[in-house]
């Protein structure tokens, strides 16, 4: 029971609207998904293995290097920036709470249990959130959604019937361009034929006028 109350504090201590909604959803049985408004879902993210996501420190360094000005700006940039701010703040509060609990629990076993719970469960959720929103800002939301769907299809396909390598997010735009180039010749081929067929007509229609 003490662990239940501690987990409740961990879930509800984040001073963000999104974290509060997650806490209320857990208590009241509401179906609240932090990815739903972005076209994804927790289930879709769950297809990616836990070791796929970089560490929280690496993700925070990436967010700071690429989007620090936008994250610190008082202006509203995009929903992804807002969600990224909330995830960063939530992780900071979780670390503060975990440090406080670790320093005040006398039982080493209980202290290790709390630290492992935060790092394993909440750490994975934060890594997923950070990765998703950083990737949306870097590659575009549609590309990230296409990647999640592609990976989900790949991982659920029996090994004998799927490519040996999983899809790679950074190569998806190149794949999309290749597909578009493969379709474009079919759209461009009629135009030269029309120009070739129309040019003699113009000369024939103009020839009587020139003879007159």
Curated annotation (Swiss-Prot):
Which ranges are cleaved off as propeptide? 184-212
Function text: May regulate immune response to the intracellular capsid in acting as a T-cell tolerogen, by having an immunoregulatory effect which prevents destruction of infected cells by cytotoxic T-cells. This immune regulation may predispose to chronicity during perinatal infections and prevent severe liver injury during adult infections.
Annotated GO biological processes are:
microtubule-dependent intracellular transport of viral material towards nucleus; symbiont entry into host cell; viral penetration into host nucleus
Q: What is this protein called?
A: External core antigen
Q: How is it modified after translation?
A: Phosphorylated.
* Residue ranges of the region described as HBEAG: 25-27
For this protein, what is any one GO molecular function term? DNA binding
Pfam families annotated for this entry? Answer: Hep_core_N, Hepatitis_core
Q: Which domain of life is it from?
A: Viruses
Major localization listed first in the record, in broad terms: secreted
The UniProt gene name for this protein comes to: C
Q: Which InterPro entries does the UniProt record give?
A: Hepatitis_B_virus_capsid_N, Hepatitis_core, Viral_capsid_core_dom_sf_HBV
Compartment(s): Secreted; Host nucleus
Family membership noted in the UniProt record: Belongs to the orthohepadnavirus precore antigen family.
User: Gene3D superfamilies this protein is in?
Assistant: Viral capsid, core domain supefamily, Hepatitis B virus
